[in-house]
Amino acid sequence: MKPTAETLCLGVESTADDFGVGIATSSGEILANASSSYIPEEGGIHPREAARHHAEAADKVLNVAFTKAKVNPRDVTLIAFAQGPGLGPCLRTGATVARALASYLDIPLVGVNHSVAHIEIGKLTTGALDPVTLYVSGGNTIVSAFDSGRYRVFGETLDMALGNCLDVFAREAGLKHRQGVPLGAALERLAADGKKLIPLPYVVKGMDISLSGLLTAATSLLQKRDIGLEDLCYSLQEHAFSMVTEVTERALAHTDKKEVLLTGGVAANKRLQAMLDVIAEEHNARFNAVPLQFATDNGAMIAWTGVLAYTHGVTTPVPKSFVKLRWRLEKVDVPWIK
């Protein structure tokens, strides 16, 4: 099937703890962005429990999206889904929903790379055209820029993602994930009241960073009665954010690009935004941060990236729509950028 004059794409996101459905047009209008989050009673994400949540939430989230967009399923001309990377059980649940919709409606299916989608929704919503991108979330920490048909990775974490580092520390500190207030936001609020910078490991190796030692050191200090939690949260943030800002600045200097884009769940952090804004200004570049509603995992970013891919000749036959748990950013062709 060839693209219609106005492609209407429904996107399904299910890589981790969020099940999201977005609806986007080929003109770049986001008509709906609905989601439901799995919140574990304790600890981090349990993949099979999260997948069960997604399966149970799918019908409701789909209905909310159709209602918000004021369209019915037969109006949709394309189905996109997050094909990877992510947690296997969660990815498979979303892929099953997407395959069922595409088959029932007899319309094309497009598998989307989750990391590419975070970049593309950031570009759409901020107007950035050719940025150095810092993508930071619970599962990814990547500095990238476009070159020769693909997004090229300039630097990344050697161990754990920035969002995971912050979340694990927050749980160890006794903070709770509540609906509407994720752990990272709770930690950010405490950090805003911190005044004392406590020395912690700072590990940058070339263009890559390591966060596990920082987390271990900060967690061990939770038992110290003479160190306030606010100061510890502040110090953890300052060290971690300085690391990713340093490697982002190096990529900016190397590429000589004139835009910086911050995207992913951690992009909501105002302190990180401020640090990146400083280095962008020093290099005569414009800083852009993805809007809050599109920072965390969402279906709209999958829908929009699906539109971009489909209108440039990309489709995914159902027999080849298997999920890709470790689908790296630089392995994805990006034909919509010339």
PLM region spans:
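Short Gly/Thr/Asp-enriched flexible loops that form oxyanion-binding sites at enzyme active sites
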Residues: F81-L105, K270-I279
